[in-house]
Structures are given as structure tokens and as C-alpha cells.
């Protein structure tokens, strides 16, 4: 039966004139198959790190797939096709040799044709390198630098754990997510430790208008500060890194100076006067490299300093205000908020990694699915072909046996015929098995890395055993211990998290955040180990209680960890369970309010169960007493005393789990016992209610105390305000008095000046009068005086008339 029509014939015209002239033996074909498998086993592919592989070829060339090339001809000629002609030639030669060796069986040729076509299809689907990128010699597959069997390299010539990377100058403005700049030194007046929301920071204290230095160094040797334009901004110490606003004067001044090599930059910073609203606030200086044309920040070339606090004088550093101690509830809330924030950051990082892997590995996943489908199809075709071939061989063997039997029956007697039949069958079976084994060996040598098919028998019962290799099935199968599965996975996650670089904008505190997350993870691991130890203790308790079988053990109670009615370790186990519940409720504040009602419900259920058990015990005792005979009445007082003792100590009887009665009890006494049990239960219930009331009172007292403290604080605040108002009034009065005194002094000075001016003016007036009198002197000897002054009055001039 011909099976070659299921496969397409291969046109050898595309591969030159080598397909028809070459001929090799079966041994050479087997050796070539083993060499190809060895070369493929050296190939290591990591699909999840495909985005980290370096493209060493030219930019216009496409990146090679992670599959070695088998385009090596024995004569050393190069071939640029997608499938090596050597594979096709060897497969065709296998067909020829098998046809020459096994002419007696026609179906063996069909088997070889099917298997060889299968290998050619497989090689054409997997070997798809680009043309002219790999050489033909087998040595170049492993020794050449462009071969894909080399280990995976990281982009920009760096390893996974190295903090620094190198890149070409063309990638400078685009950049990568890695930091290429770092702070080597930051000067300050004093360095303080400051904690907020459970996060501790190193704060650098700086005096305003006084310079402090910041030294930057490059991690990329291809960069140079002489060719870069840095820019510095003053931002708030927050997640958003908002820039500090300014109206007229910029809050920050800076001067830059680079060394001769250009790998180190010194910045002299000077913070100006800030408003009063920004006192006691933390700032940061953001240094970024800017494009000189567009003034836009270049990605990967920015750095943020440590937190900075500004003071007006150096003396203010020594004067630290005494801060009031915070309440423990506030600190707990801060730590919970910090844990929530860290969990959100971890979820964000995990989502980022997950989406990154999905986006980068879609093509590889599609290729893997296609390869798996092809493998399945090829395996099914191989199985069907082998089954058909084996059936055909069996039919031929049966026909040959029948022909031989007929010939032997015609020539010899019955006894000789039987012997000849056995010998002929043995010879035919040996020839068929040898031919089948040879064909199957050739097929297995060509397809050893995909499927291993072993034909154990060529008779009616043929067993096909398929063994997939490590390249197909046994990849990425994690083996974890049953006990430490969660713990080991958690530790691996923490190790990977430590290796991650700082992706947050807070570059200075990124490493600190990672360390805090790692410390929290270590504490969680310790808690898990403690839980395991406690669980082992619980198992030991169960073993101890389970060993004491008898009257003390009864039906299994779902609430108790063991099968005993009264477990001696019950209190310890309950205490451990309560501690676990309280601890886990700390991390779920929404469920914290439901702890108390759940505990009260559990107590009520336990009480109801105890009452039911006591009632059942009483009923059993009544039945036993009705069966027994009444005894003498003289023993009644003793029975009453025993009953009273039993009523006083019901808990001890429950712990022992046994009640022995040997006397008769009246129904009245039974009623009294029931009443006593009910009273005891009521007393227990009352005690529980009292305990609850006491707890409520205690909570109310604490609430009142808190209110009183708040009122006292409010009163203190009012007193402080009043005191401040009084001081302000006194200061105003003092200012007014000073102003009045100044006015008085000014008035006095003015009066003095006026007096001095008047005193200076008085002698001048006298001199003027004297001058006037001198001018008014009359010469009586001359007669012209009367002519000049006809109306003169001598009395006015001080002269008397003669």
C-alpha cells in the first residue's frame, strides 16, 4: 500500500545540481543526524528574556531566530536557502540504499519515503535564518561570534546585575530606563535623621543664601559634561516632585563647573529667601540634562538629591523644639499605610513585568504553538504510517507463509511439510524484522530530537513507544518541595525584587525603599516559620489525645482539634488560634470589628453544646437507675451528700468524662439536680454578661479619659492663645508708650530749636535798631536839618528842644 501520496514532493531545482549527484551510505546519514542533534543541543533559548538580547548585526538586517543553521554542504559551498540541501540529499540517498538492500519488501520503501519527507518538512519549518548571515562550515556554527549558540547578552553591553551600561552616541537623547548619572557627594551644614510615616530619611540642613556643593559623576563613558547642558530645579519632597513656585525671584541659584575629563560635574547651589509658609518643609534639588534647543528633559539623565531643610541661621540647628510623643495608634496607622503603599508598588511592578513579558513574547508564543501543532501532526502521521507499514508487512508475511506451505505440501510428506513450514516462517520473520529495524533506525537518527519510535515487533502485536526529548516537553518544569513550596517561591520573589533597579522618580530613596520591602518580606517569612512550628505542635497534641482511646474519647467534634471530649491542651490551642486571628485581623481592618461578636457566638455555641451533653448524661443515668433495684433507705442521706457534691463540682465531672452512680435517686432529687444545673448555667451566663458589661465600662472609661485629655488639651490651647493675646496687647502698649515718648522728645527738640532761633534773632534786632538811630542823628550846626526833616519830633528821638 503506497503512503507517499500523503506528502508533497520536494523540488530540488532551487538547491542547485547537488541533489541528483550526491550519494551516501546509511552510516554517513546516521552520523550527519547525530552531528545535527549535537549542534542543536548546544543551543540554549530563553524566551522570556528575548527583549534583552543584543542585536550585533547592522541596523538594516533583521535579528536571527534562536535556531542553528544546517546549511553546510560537504564540499564547503555556501547555500542561502531556508533549508539545507544536505538534509534533502541524505534523505534521498536513504531511499536509494534502502531500495537496493531490501528489494523483497516493497512497503519498506514507502516507510522510508514517509519518514524522510517528514524530516524535510520539519527542517523547512524550523530552519529559517536570513540569507548570507551564516557560513557553511560546521565549525562556524559554534565558533563564529554571530552564531546563535552563544550565551544571551544584555543590551548596551552590560549584564543583568550591572548598574551601568554603555551605549552609542546616537542613543544618548533617546536613552533607556537605566540611570547613567549619579550623585557622588552632597555637602551640608548638618545631616539629620528624620522619620515620617515609618520611613526614615537623612535630611541635609542648609543655611539660606549660603552655598553648598553637589558633585555628579557619569556612569556612561560615552557621555561628557562638556557637551551636556544641565538644569537644576527646586522641588518639594513628595511623590509628585512638584516644583517650588516663585513670583519674581527664583528660589534657587546655581553655578556649574566640569573637570577637564568631563566625567564629573560640580554644582554650587544657593537657596534664596523662602516664604514663611514653607518653613519646616523638606525640599529636593532635581538635576536634569536638557536639550539646548527644545529645553526638554532627556530620559535617563536626571537625578534627585537627598531631602534638604533650609534654616535662616546656623544657631537654629542647635535649637530643636521638643516634640510631643505620638500615640501608639497613630504609629500603627502610619505603619499600616506604609505597608499598603509598598503593596501597591509591588503590584504595580509585577503588572509591569507581566505586561512587558506578554508584549515581548507574543511572537515567540505564537511560534511555539505552531511548532507544537506541527510536532503533534508529525507524531500522529508517524504512528499511522508505522501501523500501516506493519500491517502490510504482516499481510505479506502471511502470504509468503501460505505460499511456502503450499509448495512444501506438494513436494514433501506431511511431517516434512510441518518442519519446512517452521523453518520458512523463521527465515521470513527474520528478514522482515531486520529490514524494519534498519528503516526505523534511519528514521530515528534523523528525528532523534523530536520523537523516538521503537518498533519492538513486526508481527500482529506492534508496540510503538514515543519518547519526547528535553527540547520539546521537559522544559520549564519547576520542582518544588511539598512543605517549603510557598516559602521558597516567596524567597525567590524577594531575591528578584532586590535585583530590580530603582524605577521610581525618587532616585535617592529608591534603594532604601527596596531594603525596607525586603526587611518586611523577611519578617513575613519568619512569621510563616512560626506558624509552621505551631502547627507541628498542634499535630503533636492531636497524636497525644488520639492515643488515649476509651471512655475519655467520643465522637469527633469539629470545633476541637482532637477526638477527646475534654482535651487537656484545648486552652493552649484556643489561645494560639485567637492570637492568629488577632494578628491577621490587623492586616484586614474591615474585618477587625467582627472579631468580638464571632468570639461571643462561639462561646454561646460552646455553652449550648455543654448543656446538651449534660442533659444527655442525665437521661442515660435515669435509664440506668430505672433498670437497677431500689436499695435501703438508710443510704439516702449518703446519696444526698454525694448529689450535693456532684452539683457543686460539675466541671470536674465533665473533665473526667465518667459518672458512676451505684445508688437509687428519687425523681425529686433529679428535679433538684436539673434545677441546680440550670442555675449554674444561668450563673455562667450572668457572669459572661457581667464580664461583657465590665469590658464595655472599661471601654467607656477609656473613651471618657480620652475626651478629658482632649478637653484638657483644648483648655491648654485656649490658655496659650490667651497668653499670646496678652503678650500681644502688652507689646502694643509698649509700642504705643515708646511712640508717645518719641513724640514728646521730638516736640521738646522742636521747642529747643525754636528757642535757639529766637535767641539768635534778638541781637540782630538790637543791631538794626542801633543802626537806625545812628542814621537818624541830626547835625544841629547845619541849617539843613530842618529842611530835610520838617516834621521831625525831637521827643521821639530822645532829644529835648532847646
Curated annotation (Swiss-Prot):
<keyword id="KW-0217">Developmental protein</keyword>
<keyword id="KW-0804">Transcription</keyword>
<dbReference type="GO" id="GO:0031154">
    <property type="term" value="P:culmination involved in sorocarp development"/>
</dbReference>
<keyword id="KW-0749">Sporulation</keyword>
<feature type="region of interest" description="Disordered">
    <location>
        <begin position="154"/>
        <end position="173"/>
    </location>
</feature>
<keyword id="KW-0221">Differentiation</keyword>
<protein>
    <recommendedName>
        <fullName>Putative transcriptional regulator cudA</fullName>
    </recommendedName>
</protein>
<feature type="compositionally biased region" description="Low complexity">
    <location>
        <begin position="381"/>
        <end position="445"/>
    </location>
</feature>
<comment type="function">
    <text>Essential for normal culmination. May function as a transcriptional regulator.</text>
</comment>
<feature type="compositionally biased region" description="Polar residues">
    <location>
        <begin position="129"/>
        <end position="142"/>
    </location>
</feature>
<feature type="compositionally biased region" description="Polar residues">
    <location>
        <begin position="69"/>
        <end position="88"/>
    </location>
</feature>
<dbReference type="GO" id="GO:0043565">
    <property type="term" value="F:sequence-specific DNA binding"/>
</dbReference>
<keyword id="KW-0805">Transcription regulation</keyword>
<dbReference type="GO" id="GO:0030154">
    <property type="term" value="P:cell differentiation"/>
</dbReference>
<feature type="region of interest" description="Disordered">
    <location>
        <begin position="1"/>
        <end position="148"/>
    </location>
</feature>
<dbReference type="GO" id="GO:0005654">
    <property type="term" value="C:nucleoplasm"/>
</dbReference>
<dbReference type="GO" id="GO:0097696">
    <property type="term" value="P:cell surface receptor signaling pathway via STAT"/>
</dbReference>
<feature type="compositionally biased region" description="Low complexity">
    <location>
        <begin position="89"/>
        <end position="128"/>
    </location>
</feature>
<keyword id="KW-0238">DNA-binding</keyword>
<feature type="region of interest" description="Disordered">
    <location>
        <begin position="636"/>
        <end position="658"/>
    </location>
</feature>
<dbReference type="GO" id="GO:0030435">
    <property type="term" value="P:sporulation resulting in formation of a cellular spore"/>
</dbReference>
<dbReference type="GO" id="GO:0005634">
    <property type="term" value="C:nucleus"/>
</dbReference>
<keyword id="KW-0539">Nucleus</keyword>
<dbReference type="GO" id="GO:0010628">
    <property type="term" value="P:positive regulation of gene expression"/>
</dbReference>
<feature type="region of interest" description="Disordered">
    <location>
        <begin position="381"/>
        <end position="446"/>
    </location>
</feature>
<dbReference type="InterPro" id="IPR040430">
    <property type="entry name" value="CudA-like"/>
</dbReference>
<feature type="compositionally biased region" description="Low complexity">
    <location>
        <begin position="25"/>
        <end position="63"/>
    </location>
</feature>
Amino acid at each position: 500500500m503506497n503512503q507517499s501520496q500523503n506528502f508533497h514532493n520536494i523540488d530540488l531545482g532551487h538547491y542547485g545540481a547537488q541533489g541528483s549527484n550526491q550519494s551516501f551510505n546509511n552510516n554517513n546519514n546516521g552520523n550527519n543526524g547525530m552531528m545535527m542533534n549535537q549542534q542543536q543541543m548546544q543551543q540554549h533559548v530563553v524566551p522570556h528574556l528575548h527583549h534583552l538580547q543584543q542585536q550585533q548585526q547592522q541596523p538594516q538586517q533583521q535579528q536571527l531566530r534562536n535556531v542553528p543553521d544546517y546549511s553546510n554542504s560537504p564540499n564547503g559551498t555556501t547555500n542561502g536557502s531556508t533549508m539545507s540541501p544536505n538534509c534533502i540529499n541524505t534523505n534521498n540517498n536513504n531511499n536509494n540504499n534502502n531500495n537496493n538492500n531490501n528489494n523483497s519488501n516493497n512497503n519498506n520503501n514507502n516507510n522510508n519515503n514517509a519518514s524522510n519527507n517528514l524530516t524535510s518538512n520539519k527542517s523547512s519549518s524550523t530552519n529559517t535564518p536570513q540569507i548570507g548571515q551564516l557560513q557553511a562550515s560546521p565549525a562556524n556554527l559554534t565558533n563564529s561570534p554571530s552564531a546563535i549558540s552563544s550565551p544571551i547578552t544584555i543590551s548596551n553591553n552590560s549584564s543583568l546585575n550591572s548598574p551601568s551600561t554603555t551605549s552609542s552616541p546616537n542613543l544618548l537623547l533617546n536613552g533607556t530606563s537605566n540611570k547613567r548619572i549619579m550623585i557622588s557627594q552632597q555637602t551640608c551644614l548638618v545631616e539629620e535623621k528624620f522619620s515620617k510615616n515609618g520611613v526614615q530619611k537623612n535630611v541635609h540642613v542648609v543655611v539660606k543664601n549660603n552655598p553648598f556643593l553637589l558633585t555628579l559623576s557619569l556612569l556612561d563613558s560615552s557621555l561628557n559634561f562638556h557637551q551636556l547642558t544641565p538644569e537644576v530645579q527646586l522641588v518639594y519632597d513628595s511623590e509628585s516632585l512638584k516644583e517650588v513656585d516663585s513670583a519674581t525671584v527664583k528660589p534657587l541659584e546655581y553655578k556649574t563647573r566640569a573637570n577637564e575629563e568631563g566625567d564629573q560635574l560640580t554644582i554650587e547651589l544657593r537657596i534664596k529667601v523662602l516664604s514663611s509658609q514653607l518653613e519646616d518643609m523638606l525640599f529636593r534639588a532635581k538635576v536634569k540634562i536638557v536639550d539646548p534647543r527644545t529645553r526638554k528633559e532627556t530620559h535617563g539623565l536626571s537625578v534627585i538629591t537627598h531631602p534638604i531643610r533650609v534654616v535662616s541661621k546656623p544657631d537654629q540647628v542647635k535649637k530643636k523644639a521638643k516634640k510631643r510623643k505620638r500615640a501608639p495608634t497613630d504609629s500603627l496607622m502610619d505603619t499600616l499605610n506604609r505597608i499598603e503603599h509598598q503593596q501597591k508598588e509591588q503590584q504595580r511592578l509585577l503588572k509591569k513585568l507581566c505586561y512587558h513579558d506578554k508584549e515581548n513574547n507574543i511572537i515567540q508564543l505564537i511560534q511555539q504553538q505552531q511548532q507544537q501543532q506541527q510536532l503533534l501532526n508529525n507524531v500522529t502521521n508517524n504512528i499511522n504510517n508505522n501501523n500501516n507499514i506493519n500491517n502490510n508487512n504482516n499481510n505479506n508475511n502471511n502470504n509468503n507463509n501460505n505460499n511456502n506451505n503450499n509448495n512444501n505440501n506438494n513436494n514433501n510428506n506431511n511431517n516434512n511439510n510441518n518442519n519446512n513450514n517452521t523453518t520458512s516462517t523463521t527465515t521470513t520473520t527474520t528478514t522482515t524484522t531486520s529490514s524494519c529495524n534498519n528503516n526505523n533506525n534511519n528514521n530515528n537518527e534523523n528525528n532523534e530530537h523530536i520523537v523516538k519510535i521503537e518498533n519492538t515487533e513486526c508481527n500482529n502485536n506492534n508496540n510503538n513507544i514515543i519518547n519526547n526529548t528535553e527540547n520539546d516537553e521537559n522544559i520549564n518544569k519547576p520542582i518544588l518541595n511539598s512543605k517549603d513550596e510557598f516559602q521558597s517561591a516567596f524567597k525567590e520573589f524577594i531575591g528578584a525584587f532586590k535585583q530590580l533597579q530603582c524605577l521610581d522618580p525618587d532616585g535617592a530613596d529608591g534603594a532604601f525603599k527596596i531594603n525596607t520591602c525586603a526587611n518586611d518580606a523577611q519578617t513575613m517569612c519568619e512569621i510563616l516559620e512560626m506558624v509552621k512550628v505551631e502547627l507541628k505542635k498542634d499535630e503533636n497534641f492531636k497524636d497525644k489525645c488520639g492515643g488515649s482511646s476509651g471512655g475519655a474519647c467520643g465522637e469527633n467534634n469539629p470545633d476541637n482539634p482532637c477526638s477527646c471530649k475534654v482535651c487537656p491542651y484545648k486552652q493552649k490551642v484556643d489561645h494560639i488560634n485567637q492570637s492568629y486571628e488577632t494578628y491577621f485581623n490587623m492586616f484586614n481592618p474591615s474585618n477587625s470589628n467582627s472579631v468580638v461578636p464571632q468570639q461571643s457566638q462561639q462561646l454561646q455555641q460552646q455553652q449550648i453544646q455543654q448543656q446538651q451533653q449534660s442533659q444527655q448524661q442525665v437521661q442515660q443515668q435515669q435509664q440506668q437507675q430505672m433498670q437497677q433495684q431500689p436499695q435501703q433507705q438508710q443510704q439516702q442521706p449518703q446519696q444526698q451528700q454525694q448529689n450535693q457534691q456532684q452539683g457543686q463540682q460539675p466541671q470536674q465531672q465533665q473533665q473526667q468524662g465518667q459518672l458512676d452512680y451505684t445508688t437509687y435517686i428519687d425523681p425529686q432529687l433529679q428535679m433538684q439536680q436539673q434545677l441546680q444545673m440550670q442555675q449554674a448555667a444561668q450563673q455562667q451566663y450572668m457572669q459572661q454578661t457581667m464580664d461583657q458589661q465590665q469590658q464595655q465600662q472599661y471601654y467607656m472609661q477609656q473613651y471618657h479619659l480620652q475626651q478629658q485629655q482632649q478637653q484638657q488639651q483644648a483648655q491648654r490651647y485656649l490658655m496659650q492663645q490667651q497668653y499670646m493675646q496678652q503678650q500681644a496687647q502688652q507689646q502694643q502698649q509698649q509700642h504705643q508708650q515708646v511712640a508717645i515718648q518719641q513724640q514728646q522728645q521730638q516736640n521738646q527738640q522742636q521747642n529747643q530749636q525754636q528757642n535757639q532761633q529766637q535767641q539768635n534773632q534778638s541781637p540782630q534786632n538790637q543791631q538794626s535798631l542801633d543802626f537806625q538811630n545812628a542814621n537818624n542823628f541830626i547835625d544841629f550846626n547845619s541849617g539843613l536839618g530842618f529842611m530835610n526833616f520838617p516834621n521831625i519830633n525831637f521827643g521821639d528821638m530822645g532829644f529835648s528842644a532847646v
